């Protein structure tokens, strides 16, 4: 990933696959439940829940399913007791991986993570094994079409952004993770609509993958981790050039 934009391209590729296998609603539902459990069921007083609702609606999640997920988190309906977990490990060519998961059975999820890393030429590490290689940041992506670049960059910085870049038809706004919700709300109030908005783990340095076979192995691990039922987000520090990445589709 040269820069976060290429990482977004990989995530978009996975996003299309997620929709085909209908896993996206499960991810939305768990995030809604966790967000409601953490901060209550009223999105007016719970920024994380507000963002989760926006994403679920954008992904065409049925309203009744969305509302049930929130009520399970707020305690209005009986539901599974989910816990957020993080797993860290190494993949092929020394690549680092972080998996954020939501689980109702820590032992099951840990076993599945360990098995997946092992089967795909990787190793599951201890807590903190690779997280020091990443920084937790807010990332907001806005389509650049029809927007004056100078005006947007000024608006984003005034909104509290840490950095703004433009690449491949999109503006990418980076924030301190503690300022993410504030910057997002400020941009929306200024009239800008986001394409994606999330708290992400950004690698401080990347591992460049220059041959197709190694790229296949790295992406095989990435895909396998994404496919696990309890996985919510998968981050890594690999950098696969576009010309090689295109051969993997």
Swiss-Prot record:
**Example of a GO cellular component annotation carried by this entry:** cytosol
Question: A Gene Ontology MF term for this entry?
Answer: DNA binding
Composition bias, Polar residues: 1-10
**Region feature (Disordered):** 1-20
A Gene Ontology biological process annotation?
regulation of DNA-templated transcription
Chief localization: cytoplasm
Keywords carried by this UniProt record: Cytoplasm, DNA-binding, Transcription, Transcription regulation
One Pfam entry for this protein is Transcrip_reg
Do you know which Gene3D superfamilies this protein is assigned to?
1.10.10.200, 3.30.70.980
Q: Which subcellular locations apply to this protein?
A: Cytoplasm
The similarity comment for this entry is: Belongs to the TACO1 family.
Q: Which PANTHER family match?
A: TRANSCRIPTIONAL REGULATORY PROTEIN YEBC-RELATED (PTHR12532:SF6), TRANSLATIONAL ACTIVATOR OF CYTOCHROME C OXIDASE 1 (PTHR12532)
NCBIfam families documented for this protein: PRK00110.1 (NF001030), PRK12378.1 (NF009044), YebC/PmpR family DNA-binding transcriptional regulator (TIGR01033)
What protein name does the entry list? Probable transcriptional regulatory protein FN1661
């Amino acid at each position: 990933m040269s820069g976060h934009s290429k990482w977004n391209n990989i995530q978009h590729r996975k996003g299309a696959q997620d929709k085909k296998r209908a896993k996206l609603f499960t991810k939305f539902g768990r995030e809604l439940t966790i967000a409601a459990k953490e901060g209550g069921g009223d999105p007016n007083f719970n920024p994380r829940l507000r963002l989760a609702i926006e994403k679920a609606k954008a992904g065409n999640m049925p309203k009744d399913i969305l509302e049930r997920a929130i009520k399970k988190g707020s305690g209005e309906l009986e539901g599974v007791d989910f816990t957020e977990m993080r797993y860290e490990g190494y993949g092929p060519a020394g690549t680092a991986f972080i998996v954020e998961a939501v689980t109702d059975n820590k032992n099951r999820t840990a076993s599945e993570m360990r098995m997946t890393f092992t089967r795909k030429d990787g190793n599951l590490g201890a807590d903190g094994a690779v997280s020091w290689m990443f920084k937790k940041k807010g990332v907001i992506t806005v389509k650049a079409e029809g927007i004056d670049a100078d005006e947007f960059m000024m608006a984003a910085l005034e909104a509290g952004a840490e950095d703004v870049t433009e690449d491949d038809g999109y503006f990418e706004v980076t924030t301190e993770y503690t300022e993410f919700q504030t910057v997002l709300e400020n941009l929306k109030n200024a009239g800008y609509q986001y394409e994606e908005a999330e708290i992400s783990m950004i690698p401080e340095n990347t591992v460049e993958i220059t041959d197709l076979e190694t790229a296949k192995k790295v992406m095989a691990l990435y895909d396998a981790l994404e496919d696990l039922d309890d996985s919510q987000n998968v981050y890594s520090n690999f950098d696969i050039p576009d010309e090689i990445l295109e051969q993997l589709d």
